[in-house]
């Protein structure tokens, strides 16, 4: 995600920017963030706290010591840890990657099947142009510079994930503008209508007055039946 083919940002910076914009456009949604390279880690669990989500996005960094990309593990963790107990009708995962699954115990297609069984849609997005791309390199003599590096992007697997989870076909973003357009399209597709249900609790207040009226009526009957006949006529 450090490749600079999304200049002036690298791929990670571009992905973070569009993700923050996506969050800001959906004020009623909950979000979670799972980051993966060699390992998959939950950065923030499912939350309505959008500022916390944005803060987590801004803190994302590339682990340059990682020796692989675990797409399957990242997707599986998003499914199992984030959505397993969530019952909303619309549950989606936006899977953004620029590499090939080459490590991890769970295959991406197995993770996609897990998502399908729970009714979760996965929108895979491959970022970056395939082939030789400018990549930052710290040279001990010449300092920081860029070298052209070959980075492979496994679009066939991403397409299969989309097919399994019924989202059609994976998208490929070769620049920041196209990535933003793809996210906007997902935003339009996944609009959820919310139905508000209200429960009203009416407390009946007339019963004390009813009992009071009944008591007064009973008292009147008793007076007429037992007390009034005993009184002298002249009173």
Describe each model-derived feature in a short phrase.
Residues 69, 92, 99-164:
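VWA/integrin I-like adhesion module and closely mimicked acidic/polar interface patches used
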Residues 1, 22-30, 57-64, 78-86, ...:
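Sec/Tat-exported extracytoplasmic proteins
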Residues 34-37, 96-99, 125-128, 173-174:
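Active-site-proximal beta-strand/loop segments in catalytic clefts of secreted hydrolases
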Residues 15, 78, 122, 162, ...:
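Residue-level signature of catalytic and energy-coupling elements of molecular machines
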Residues 172-206:
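Juxtamembrane amphipathic/hinge helix adjacent to a transmembrane helix
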